[in-house]
A protein has these predicted regions:
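Charge-rich amphipathic alpha-helical interaction elements
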Residues: 1-159
Length: 159
């Protein structure tokens, strides 16, 4: 029983660790989703900006203005590249957090299984004690009835 108390304390700690690992994993997943959205927005902005440049080009673009468009598009490309690199790093981190969470989950389940094993063992021991008491009662009852029957038989023989 005292060992179960200690195991329950360990189980509580494991649950807290698992919850914290889960929160970290979810946070990273949300970061990945945010970066994917940002990249999509930058790419959409780039696409729209190129469309604007093409429209202006049809009506005539100066060399300076064309260079300005190209420089800005290049900046957008660099931003998207850096965000994709960060996205890959975040995806790897998210997978690490997922693996860590799964390990914490296994740790908790091991303690729960051990507690369940102890509970089943105690239950079996209790059933054995109850069966022993029942057997002792049956034997004592049989012995008492047998003695009474023997006394009746002796009295009957004496008559």
């Amino acid at each position: 029983m005292p060992e179960d108390r200690a195991l329950h304390l360990v189980l509580d700690k494991r649950k807290r660790d698992e919850d914290a690992a889960f929160e970290d994993w979810v946070f990273c997943r949300n970061q990945v989703a945010n970066f994917e959205l940002q990249i999509k927005q930058v790419e959409e902005f780039r696409f729209n900006y190129i469309g604007e440049m093409e429209n202006e080009g049809r009506s005539g673009l100066t060399g300076t203005k064309l260079l300005a468009y190209q420089a800005f598009i290049e900046k957008l490309d660099n931003i998207a590249l850096k965000q994709r690199q960060e996205l890959e790093r975040l995806k790897m981190l998210t997978e690490q957090k997922r693996q860590f969470y799964l390990k914490r989950q296994v740790d908790r389940k091991v303690i729960e299984a051990l507690l369940e094993k102890h509970r089943i063992r105690r239950q079996k021991e209790e059933l054995k004690r109850e069966q022993k008491l029942l057997d002792e009662y049956v034997v004592a009852n049989y012995t008492r009835r047998r003695q009474v029957q023997d006394e009746i038989n002796l009295e009957a023989e004496a008559l």
